[in-house]
A protein has these predicted regions:
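Short, glycine-anchored, charge-dense loop/turn motifs used at functional sites
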Residues: 16, 112, 116-124, 230-244
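CN hydrolase (nitrilase-like) catalytic-core segments centered on the catalytic cysteine
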Residues: 81-98, 156, 166-253
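Short beta->alpha transition motifs characteristic of CBS
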Residues: 64, 71, 115, 126-133, ...
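Active-site catalytic loop in hydrolytic enzyme cores
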Residues: 88, 105-180, 185-202, 225, ...
Length: 341
């Protein structure tokens, strides 16, 4: 039940608006400034559209479009004018918003980043995409882990970006750290439609967690993004889904309190608990070991597939990018919760 898209808001509900933003073309700093202003205008539209809305979500690539341009002149900085404008929009409209930016990285390729700013102008969540959509995307692999923040009306929220959601471990990490709502922003195009839907539903069901997901929408003359906003309840049931109409705002009320209840009282299919307590009917507390070889190997830095040497695509040359010469070096980052008047 979505409360008629949030029109009938319950005391424990969180009303979300998923913006199927028209795919932009951003080539210059002037284009970036214009798109920033457009997004801020849509924040105001969302507030006017539904006074009870708590959180608005913009898709991946909302500022930069799908060109994969790494030109530093159009990259964002956390202390730059784009984030400052977004913060003012949140304060002026008294609403929480999830934004997408391509973030300047002085040590390598830009990061594909997402931020959540609250209605008081505080930065609540700052995430860098862990799994760029290789070999198509040139972004630096994220180095901030998967943060979870306190959200509106007592909720717990995590953010992942696009291709991240194809890895079940990403959703499991969000839930393990307490997320009741997992936002997934994306720029996907039509060939991914089926995978998008089944992964959003599986991520919800497997973790007793609401998933709220949205793509860019429309055409930029080269690419066609699919829209396909969707909110899935914690049992895997589709609550609302969008069309292919650019700038449509899909709304839904979700209930974090019912997520918490299910995690406490469910027996059958309480998978997030049972994963670490195997066979608790037979043995007290269940088996608490880690029988998964790939997990042990990854921690040891020895993750190698049986067919590893036969994998054909291991860099971005097929998509026009040069062979990388740097190894992965995570950079120390200071994230500071700030408020803007």
């Amino acid at each position: 039940m979505s409360g008629l898209g949030g029109l009938n808001k319950s005391p424990n509900g969180v009303v979300m608006g998923m913006v199927q933003l028209q795919l932009p073309v951003t080539k210059t700093p002037a284009d970036l400034a214009a798109q920033t202003a457009r997004i801020c205008d849509l924040v105001a539209k969302a507030r006017r559209n539904m006074p009870g809305m708590d959180l608005v979500v913009f898709p991946e690539y909302a500022l930069h479009g799908l060109s994969m341009d790494t030109n530093p002149d159009i990259m964002c900085r956390m202390d730059g004018p784009e984030v400052a404008a977004f913060t003012r929009a949140c304060v002026q409209n008294k609403i929480w918003v999830c934004f997408s930016i391509m973030e300047f990285n002085p040590h390598g390729n830009p990061y594909n980043s997402g931020i959540i700013i609250d209605d008081q102008g505080a930065l609540k969540l700052y995430y860098r995409k862990l799994h760029p959509w290789v070999p198509v995307e040139p972004w630096e692999p994220g180095d901030l882990g998967i943060p979870v923040c306190d959200g509106p009306n007592g909720s717990k929220i995590a953010l992942i970006i696009c291709h991240d959601g194809m890895f079940p471990e990403m959703a499991r990490e969000c839930a393990y750290k307490g997320a009741e709502i997992m936002i997934r922003t994306a720029g996907y195009t039509a060939p991914i439609r089926h995978s998008w839907k089944i992964s959003n539903q599986a991520n919800a069901f497997s973790n007793l967690m609401v998933t709220a997901s949205v793509c860019m929408c429309g055409s930029d003359g080269t690419f066609d993004s699919m829209g396909e906003g969707m909110v899935v309840d914690f049992d895997g049931t589709l609550m609302v889904d969008g069309s292919h109409r650019p700038d449509e705002i899909i709304t839904c009320e979700v209930r974090p309190d019912l997520v918490r209840e299910a995690r406490r009282v469910w027996g059958v299919e309480n998978n997030i608990y049972q994963f670490g307590h195997r066979g608790y009917v037979a043995v007290k507390g269940g088996a608490r070991d880690c029988p998964y070889t790939y997990m042990q190997d990854m921690v040891a830095g020895k993750y190698v597939l049986p067919w590893e040497k036969d994998v054909a695509v291991t860099d971005g040359t097929s998509c026009g990018f040069p062979v990388p010469t740097r190894g992965y070096q995570p950079q120390p980052v200071i994230t500071e919760k700030r408020k803007y008047a």
